[in-house]
Design a protein with these regions (language model features):
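Short, acidic, metal-binding catalytic loop of nucleotide-sugar glycosyltransferases
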Residues: 61-72
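Long helical/loop segments within the catalytic core of UDP-sugar-dependent glycosyltransferases
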Residues: 110-112, 136-214, 352
C-alpha cells in the first residue's frame, strides 16, 4: 500500500511538469480562420498603479510609442491610493488620450481595474502592468487576433529581464519560458487557461464585475471559456517584465498569485467538469490544479519513502531517499546563496523548485484560513 501511495505521488509530480507537456506536444493543432492583420479597432488601455511615481511617465511614453493608430488609443490610469505623486505626474502628462482616475481609499488592483473598465469608451480592453515594457508592434500584434470573432482574449509573450533591461538565465526565467511554451501549445490546440497579467487584450463583454479578492488574469480567461470563446497566446506580442530583485519578495509574489488563482478556480469551479467542458477541463486540472497540488505530492513521496526505506535501506528505496534528500539539501544551499549570481545552475533550480512549492503550501494555508487578499505591494523593480 505504501508503495502505491509513493508511486501515485511521484507520477502526479512527473505528469504535472513533464507528462502534460508531452500530451500537448503530441496533439494536433486546431484549425484557425485566416486573419488579415488589418484589424485595428479603437482600444481602451487600462493601467492600475500603486506608488508608481518612479515609472509612470516611462510607462506612458512607452505605451504611446506604439505603432497602433494614436487616434484609436484611450489610456486610463487608475491610481490605488498612491501618495507618492503618481497622480500629479499623470495629470501633468499633457496628452489628451491619457486620463486619470483616483481610487481612494486603497482597494486593490482588481477594484482599480473595475473603475477603469467602467470609464472605458471602447469594446476592446487592454490591461498592462506599470513596469511592463512593450515593443512598438506589441499592441497591434495583440489586437489583430481579435479579428477572429471566436477569440475573446489574447495574451502576450512574457520575457523576464533584469532591472537594466538585459536578459538573464535565472531559474525564474527558465520557468517563464516553460510556461510560455505551454501556453503557445494550448493556444494552438484549444485555449489557454490563464493570461499574462502584464499585458493582454479582452473583449469588454467578458469583463464581469468580480469580487475584489480575485485576480483578473485568471478569472477573465475562465469567463471567456465559460461563454464558449477561445483565449490565445500570441508570441509576437512581446512584453518585457522586470524581475523582482529580491528572492524573498518573489516568494511572497508567488504565494499571492497562487492564492488568487485558487480563488479564481474555486469561483469558476464548474469548469473543472470534463463531462461539460471536455479537454479544457483536462487543461485546468493539468496546468493549474495538479501544479498547485504538487507540494502535497512531494510530501507524500517523502513520507512514504521514509517508511519504506526503514524496512530495507539498501534497496531502491534507499536510492530514492538519497535523491530526495539531495534535492532538499541543494535547495538549502540555494537559499543560503540566493543572492549570489555565481551559484551553480542546478543549485539555483533546486532552490527555485522547492521555494516555489513552499509558496504553494503557504497559498493553501492562506486559502483555508482567510482566503482573500485584495491589495498588492509596490511595482516590480521598485525599491
Amino acid at each position: 500500500m505504501l508503495e502505491a501511495f509513493f508511486w501515485i505521488a511521484v507520477l502526479m509530480v512527473l505528469y504535472t511538469y513533464a507528462g502534460y507537456a508531452l500530451v500537448l506536444r503530441l496533439m494536433p493543432k486546431a484549425p484557425r480562420p485566416e486573419i488579415t492583420g488589418q484589424f485595428s479597432p479603437p482600444v481602451s488601455i487600462i493601467i492600475a498603479a500603486y506608488k508608481g511615481a518612479g515609472v509612470i511617465k516611462q510607462k506612458l511614453d512607452n505605451t504611446l510609442a506604439s505603432d497602433y493608430p494614436r487616434a484609436k488609443l484611450e489610456v486610463i490610469v487608475v491610481t490605488d491610493g498612491s501618495d507618492d505623486g503618481t497622480d500629479t505626474i499623470v495629470e501633468r502628462y499633457g496628452d489628451p488620450c491619457v486620463s486619470l482616475i483616483r481610487q481612494v481609499p486603497r482597494a486593490g488592483k482588481t477594484a482599480a481595474q473595475k473603475k477603469g473598465v467602467a470609464a472605458a469608451k471602447y469594446e476592446i480592453l487592454i490591461f498592462t502592468d506599470l513596469t511592463t515594457v512593450l515593443e512598438s508592434k506589441s499592441i497591434p500584434e495583440l489586437v489583430k487576433n481579435l479579428e477572429d470573432p471566436s477569440i475573446g482574449l489574447v495574451s502576450s509573450e512574457d520575457i523576464w529581464v533584469k532591472l537594466d533591461g538585459t536578459t538573464t538565465e535565472s531559474a525564474q526565467c527558465a520557468y517563464v519560458k516553460y510556461e510560455m511554451w505551454l501556453r503557445n501549445r494550448e493556444s494552438e490546440i484549444s485555449s489557454i487557461v490563464s493570461a499574462s497579467g502584464c499585458f493582454y487584450a479582452v473583449r469588454k463583454m467578458f469583463f464581469e464585475p468580480i469580487p475584489d479578492y480575485l485576480i483578473d488574469d485568471t478569472v477573465i480567461p475562465l469567463t471567456v471559456a465559460e461563454h464558449g470563446f477561445r483565449c490565445l497566446h500570441h508570441a509576437d506580442a512581446r512584453s518585457y517584465v522586470p524581475m523582482i530583485p529580491s528572492a524573498d519578495r518573489e516568494f511572497t509574489r508567488r504565494a499571492r498569485m497562487t492564492l488568487g488563482g485558487i480563488n479564481a478556480l474555486m469561483y469558476k469551479k464548474g469548469l473543472l467538469n470534463p463531462l461539460k467542458y471536455g479537454f479544457y477541463s483536462v487543461q485546468l486540472w493539468s496546468h493549474k490544479m495538479f501544479r498547485w497540488l504538487v507540494p502535497f505530492g512531494l510530501l507524500a513521496a517523502l513520507i512514504t519513502n521514509a517508511r519504506l526505506v526503514s524496512h530495507d535501506p539498501l534497496s531502491f528505496w534507499g536510492i530514492a531517499m538519497l535523491a530526495q534528500l539531495g534535492l532538499y539539501a541543494a535547495a538549502v544551499v540555494g537559499f543560503v546563496r540566493r543572492n549570489q549570481p555565481s551559484t551553480h545552475k542546478l543549485i539555483r533550480l533546486s532552490y527555485f523548485f522547492v521555494s516555489s512549492n513552499l509558496a504553494l503550501l503557504l497559498s493553501w494555508y492562506q486559502f483555508v484560513t482567510s482566503g482573500k487578499q485584495t491589495t498588492w505591494s509596490e511595482s516590480r523593480g521598485q525599491a
